[in-house]
């Protein structure tokens, strides 16, 4: 999916799970704030919201016995490894890659669990 401009969650990213959609909005906001201010504080905040969201989402998958939990968790872990490797100020290329990752992850990976959690 194309990166939304301005960079924000839109109904195109709706998973049908309000708690997950709310957290996805926070992820978009976190990356947008990081792109605007690009401080260590904003980087730490972005890492924190991604960590919390992935924990919540994966917990929901486990409780629902979602068949692709391990595969999905591995994808999350790969992105977290990338984010934790960022240093402030985060280069624009890395920010763009992170924004693209999120904008693509939701419709290509998260949509797979629609109706299954």
From Swiss-Prot:
It comes from Lingula anatina (Brachiopod). This is Hemerythrin subunit beta. Belongs to the hemerythrin family. GO terms for molecular function: iron ion binding; oxygen carrier activity. Fe cation 2 binds at residues 57, 72, 76, 105, 110. CDD domains: Hemerythrin. Hemerythrin is a respiratory protein in blood cells of certain marine worms. The oxygen-binding site in each chain contains two iron atoms. Keywords: Iron, Metal-binding, Oxygen transport, Transport. Fe cation 1 binds at residues 24, 53, 57, 110.
């Amino acid at each position: 999916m194309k990166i939304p401009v301005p960079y924000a969650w839109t109904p195109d990213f709706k998973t049908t799970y309000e708690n997950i959609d709310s957290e996805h909005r926070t992820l978009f906001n976190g990356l947008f704030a990081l792109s605007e201010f690009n401080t260590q504080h904003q980087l730490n905040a972005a890492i924190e919201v991604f960590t919390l969201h992935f924990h919540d989402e994966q917990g929901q998958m486990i409780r629902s016995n979602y068949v692709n939990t391990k595969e999905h968790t591995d994808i999350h872990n790969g992105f977290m490894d990338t984010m934790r490797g960022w240093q402030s100020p985060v280069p624009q290329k890395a920010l763009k890659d992170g924004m693209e990752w999120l904008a693509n992850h939701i419709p290509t990976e998260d949509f797979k669990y629609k109706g299954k959690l």
